[in-house]
């Protein structure tokens, strides 16, 4: 999985929004320590979390499984643009069979699938991938129908935009050891992709 922060709102946008409430612009230090502390104090300590919604982050996420994508989409205050399965399935039409299930073919399948820490689950995912390949290349099934046979482990690619308040909620829930392991990895990757000067707003959200 690869996560890149493509764009983000400067911190001073949030601090200026907060200062609008009290008309305290003269105390601003133009995004310096005073303003950073103000955002944390008002948004995190005093729990006026709506002020954090002025901060927005735009991520590119590569290699997330379709199963994890479903869980990510449950975080409603966010925008997703996902690689179409029509174009995804074009990639599979011309590849060779993934059988037999040997080391070479399992390694080839990793281009398309997210593997987990269970050999049998991974083998079943590759068999599902092979069935999908057969539908496309040997039976000429249209992509719109063939996608119903896509395994949940199939990798996807998306643009993901979310505000700081919603991102805090996501990191809090998905960094827990009760969350799906792939979602734990995603939460860590999203945090790591944030600009360093923004990470202090989210450090308390991480469960481990």
UniProtKB/Swiss-Prot annotation:
Cited SUPFAM superfamilies: Thymidylate synthase-complementing protein Thy1
Catalytic residue list: 174 (involved in ionization of n3 of dump, leading to its activation)
InterPro entries from the UniProt entry: Thymidylate_synthase_ThyX, Thymidylate_synthase_ThyX_sf
Keywords: FAD, Flavoprotein, Methyltransferase, NADP, Nucleotide biosynthesis, Transferase
Binding site for FAD: 50, 74-76, 163-165, 169
All residue ranges annotated as the ThyX domain in the record: 1-208
Co-factor(s): FAD
Pfam families xrefs: Thy1
Record carries keyword Transferase: yes
GO molecular function: flavin adenine dinucleotide binding; NADPH binding; thymidylate synthase (FAD) activity; thymidylate synthase activity
Enzyme class: transferase
Renumbered ranges of motif ThyX motif: 74-84
Keyword Ion transport attributed: no
Binding site for dUMP: 71-74, 84-86, 147, 174
GO BP of this protein: dTMP biosynthetic process; dTTP biosynthetic process; methylation
Free-text comment on the cofactor: Binds 4 FAD per tetramer. Each FAD binding site is formed by three monomers.
Origin: domain of life: Bacteria
Annotated pathway: Pyrimidine metabolism; dTTP biosynthesis
Record function comment: Catalyzes the reductive methylation of 2'-deoxyuridine-5'-monophosphate (dUMP) to 2'-deoxythymidine-5'-monophosphate (dTMP) while utilizing 5,10-methylenetetrahydrofolate (mTHF) as the methyl donor, and NADPH and FADH(2) as the reductant.
PANTHER family xref list: FLAVIN-DEPENDENT THYMIDYLATE SYNTHASE (PTHR34934:SF1)
Subunit structure: Homotetramer.
Family the UniProt entry places it in: Belongs to the thymidylate synthase ThyX family.
Stated name of the protein: Flavin-dependent thymidylate synthase
Organism name: Helicobacter pylori (strain J99 / ATCC 700824) (Campylobacter pylori J99)
Underlying gene: thyX
